[in-house]
Amino acid sequence: MKKIVILSFLFLFAKLSFAESGWQLGATVPIGASFSFYNVYFSKDAPQSYKDNYRKNSGTVGFDAGITFQAGYLVTDEEKGISLLVDIGYSHDSFGLKSSYKDETTQQDINVREYYTFENMQIGILPKFHYNNFAFGLGIGVKVPLYLTHSAEFFNDNTSTKTFSYYDVGKIDDVMKNIVMTYIKLTFDYSFNIQDNVALLVGAYIGTDFGIDLRGAEKVLVESRNLASLDIGAQVGMKFGTTIGN
């Protein structure tokens, strides 16, 4: 299947390479929601109190935003085309988690809501398929965390306690075993050509961030502690260079 997709892409690119072509530059601002998924597996030596602290019942909604810059080349036959873009920028990604446990001392139920908020540099590629003013993209790349904020709020009856922890690029490995996360995204946008070689983009995206191993220093009692998300949102942007459509 993978070979068929690659061959189809190369065939279409070769077919269009004899048509009009040109460079494209652009910038995009995505804003959306993040739905988190969390899995943890403990070693056989982990005590129950330790498991209660690190086990999470479910994910909750986080917030994503950022700005990315694209540069690449478009080949087109005026109605349809293919572009291959480098996609570089900044992303703000938050992962929300919920859990609950019983305090061994007071025997009271404790509810916990926590967020891992990453400030990332991202780099990847974004091939796009164009038809008139519409474009569909499939992006893949990595995000490198530059700063991490971990916040947690503990609810007990009518009281709550908040904690915050901050990790710069030199200390993120206290929390993460790996130093990068992987992303995949599907994009859709519509171009409003406002003048020659300038277009306004309005669209949407759906994607996932994964490969986040939160073991950090907890490598003895935890065998794996993985965080991922499903991201959905809207995006606006501008592009400059060769365009398709009206």
Provide a role label for each language-model segment.
Residues 19-80, 231, 237-246:
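Short glycine/proline- and aromatic-enriched beta-strand/turn motifs that initiate or cap beta-hairpins
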Residues 4-14:
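Sec-dependent N-terminal signal peptides
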